[in-house]
Regions:
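Coil residues (strongly favoring Ser/Thr
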Residues: 15-16, 20-21, 25-26, 30-31, ...
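Outer-membrane beta-barrel proteins
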Residues: 171-173, 177, 199-224, 268-274, ...
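Exposed, low-structure sequence patches enriched in small/polar residues
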Residues: 126-128, 168, 279, 284, ...
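Outer-membrane beta-barrel translocator/receptor signature
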Residues: 148-153, 159-217, 228-229
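Flexible loop and strand-edge segments within Gram-negative outer membrane beta-barrel domains
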Residues: 208, 230-290, 302-321, 415
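Boundary at the C-terminal end of the N-terminal hydrophobic targeting segment
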Residues: 8-12
């Protein structure tokens, strides 16, 4: 009570003194000063939150493979991956670094396009794809579409750590086979990434005049301007110096009189030199950090140099290509639309083999995706390309994908197309071969479908097939001039069954490919039509931990069996062209077995592949492409090592 009274008296005294005063009451102000609270410390070194970019993926594309699967496999080049697909028939020339061909689900080499993050690696003159140009050790994912043609989209691996990353790949086998590749990558911040890869490769010396020497450089970078804008750039250079045998002299394919000393090449002193450079730079946008990119603008510069002097003639060109492309994606609930426009210009700096010195084209396309149900997707596509020489190409197609209770999946796709002749087929000029400016567009319809049944969590069976009806396809005629075909039909089908659990991977498949000329043109009567090909494949692998779980090992075999002879495609080196109409002796029936082992210990993998292990057992050797013998037995040993910090 006394304390309270004293306080009251003091307050009264102060108030009485302040009645006539205009001074600020400092005691009152101090009495309401808020208490000091602890302030949070600002960590200037805290990493910036950047959500990884998601690139746009075209509608209707299926997943083929990814980095997690590829790391256990050993492929000298990306063509080798296709050679062992269950739905493919391969036509290889015997050494890596060459223009190999693959018939994938009935789609021939001239119906295929490959896109590496915006770079179209098709040859602008011939339309062919060189699988050696694809940096397959850098692949993150692969998706494909089978409709009017075959389209493959390849996305490269991404790295999401700030520490530097490097890897070393080395493969070696007998004769002159060797692969050496190393990469260095660094995220300098959460926004900026740079990487550089060099790949040296060589093969050959198992037969005369088949040595291959090449290398590849990939420089790549991307930078986030902010959370929703990214700039990406890729430089890709491929260089090869190849001895060119122009095929080998074959009397009896069954006798297979080939080795490194006893083989007669059709050309004894021809060497080709190839250099291709691609550089693409683009800016891309997304609505927010959790969205897929919805808009982009790309500019691409490409330089193609090729030189091949031989006895009768010389192939030589230096072609420059400039292109620009823009796309925009619209998403409204279950409806998505992509619009795309592009323009390209092509001009020769040097040219000895084409009547055309330059050309250009513009393209427009749209894709539509509708998801009316959770297990149903319907897609549609329209594309148009207009070339400066007056030719126009179109394609209208679509399809649907249905999944039922994760047990049954059904997909079908189809297209009506009008495909332009290639620049080579129209304007080629050499001593022995000529283009034809009177060629018409190939027109037709293509239908593709596939069905897969998951019998349980381990067993899967399925089938797929393609039917094509067309006319005016371009072929090399009997007078060495390109001509249009009559009505043609082709059918291809595959059936397979697979078993997979934590210990075993087993798969068996059979592929049939048939081609028929319904109404042959007189000028094309010598062509080798009406061919049927059957390939049967079996794969069996066992996998698991070993050495007290210190290593994970995968071991198995792959077999290929072709039970009937058939007329093969033939690579015309003088044209740099895959003829569908080889007049050589049919390829005999053959079989092949490859044994593989891969083992991972921490960040190091050891891979081994015993190619053509049964060579000499039941057959002396075999061919996949007419006049080009496949290599004998060899053991490839490789090391994959990744380093951080």
């Amino acid at each position: 009570m006394m304390c309270f009274s004293s306080s009251a008296k003091a307050q009264v005294s102060q108030d009485s003194l302040a009645v006539d005063s205009i001074k600020v009451d400092s005691v009152l102000v101090d009495s309401i000063k808020p208490p000091m609270l602890p302030q949070p410390k600002i960590d200037k070194n805290k990493p910036e939150q950047i959500i990884p970019w998601q690139q746009f993926r075209s509608y209707g594309f299926n997943s083929v493979t990814n980095d997690s699967l590829l790391r256990w496999e050993i492929w000298p080049n990306w063509g080798e991956f296709y050679a062992y697909r269950k739905d493919a028939i391969s036509f290889r020339q015997g050494t890596t670094g060459r223009f190999d061909a693959f018939q994938v689900s009935g789609f021939n080499p001239y119906e295929q396009t490959f896109n590496i993050e915006g770079i179209d690696i098709s040859n602008p003159i011939t339309g062919l794809v060189n699988y050696n140009y694809i940096p397959h050790h850098k692949i993150g994912s692969v998706h494909e579409l089978k409709s009017g043609g075959y389209q493959s989209e390849i996305e490269l691996k991404k790295y999401y750590i700030l520490e530097p990353v490097s890897y070393l790949n080395y493969d070696e086998a007998k004769y002159d086979y060797r692969n050496l590749e190393f990469m260095v990558a660094q995220n300098f911040s959460e926004r900026t990434h740079l990487e550089l890869t060099f790949w040296d490769r060589r093969d050959g010396d198992n037969y005369q005049r088949n040595d291959v020497l090449g290398n590849q450089i990939v420089a790549r970078g991307y930078h986030y301007l902010n959370q929703n804008i990214q700039i990406r750039s890729i430089f890709l250079r491929n260089q090869f110096e190849n001895e060119e045998p122009f095929g080998y002299f074959v009397i009896d394919p069954l006798a297979f009189s080939f080795d490194r000393f006893a083989s007669s090449s059709n050309e004894s002193n021809a060497t080709s030199k190839t250099t291709r450079r691609d550089w693409i730079t683009g800016v891309y946008f997304r609505a927010d950090s959790n969205s897929i990119e919805h808009m982009g603008l790309e500019i691409t510069l490409t330089k193609n140099e090729f030189n091949l002097p031989f006895t009768e003639d010389t192939l030589n060109w230096d072609l420059r290509n400039y292109s620009a492309k823009a796309f925009k994606v619209f998403d409204v609930n279950s409806f998505s639309l992509k619009l795309e426009a592009g323009a390209r210009a092509h001009s020769f700096k040097e040219n000895e083999n084409l009547l055309k010195s330059d050309w250009s084209d513009i393209s427009l396309s749209s894709q539509i995706s509708v998801n009316p149900l959770a297990n149903l997707e319907a897609v549609g596509r329209v594309s148009l390309i207009q070339r400066s020489d007056g030719y126009t190409g179109t394609e209208v197609g679509g399809g649907a994908f249905i999944s039922l209770n994760n047990k049954i999946s059904l997909k079908f796709d189809g297209a009506v197309f009008s495909r332009m002749p290639s620049i080579q087929e129209l304007y080629w000029r050499s001593i022995n071969f000529s283009g034809n400016t009177d060629l018409k567009n190939e027109t037709g319809i293509s239908l593709y479908g596939e069905l897969e049944l998951n019998l349980n969590s381990f067993i899967k069976i399925g089938t797929s097939g393609r039917i094509k009806q067309a006319k005016n396809d371009a072929f090399l005629g009997s007078d060495s001039v390109f001509v249009n075909s009559g009505d043609i039909s082709s059918i291809s089908g595959t059936v397979f069954g697979s078993f997979q659990n934590h210990r075993f991977e087993i798969e068996s498949s059979a592929t049939v490919d048939a081609f028929n000329d319904i109404n042959p043109q007189v000028s094309a009567t010598p062509l080798d039509y009406n061919e049927q090909k059957i390939w049967i494949r079996n794969n069996a692998f066992i996998k698991g931990y070993a050495f007290d779980r210190a290593a994970f090992i995968k071991l198995g075999i792959r077999t290929t069996f072709s039970p009937i002879p058939y007329g093969s495609k033939f690579f015309n080196t003088e044209l740099q062209y895959w003829q569908a109409n080889s007049l050589e002796t049919d390829i005999p029936a053959f079989f092949r077995l490859d044994a593989e082992l891969s083992a991972r210990v921490r960040s190091i993998m050891v891979v081994m592949r015993w190619e053509n292990a049964l060579d000499g057992v039941g057959q002396l050797g075999y061919f996949e492409a007419a006049t080009f013998p496949m290599p004998a037995r060899r053991l490839i040993v490789g090391i994959r090592a990744q380093f951080r910090n």
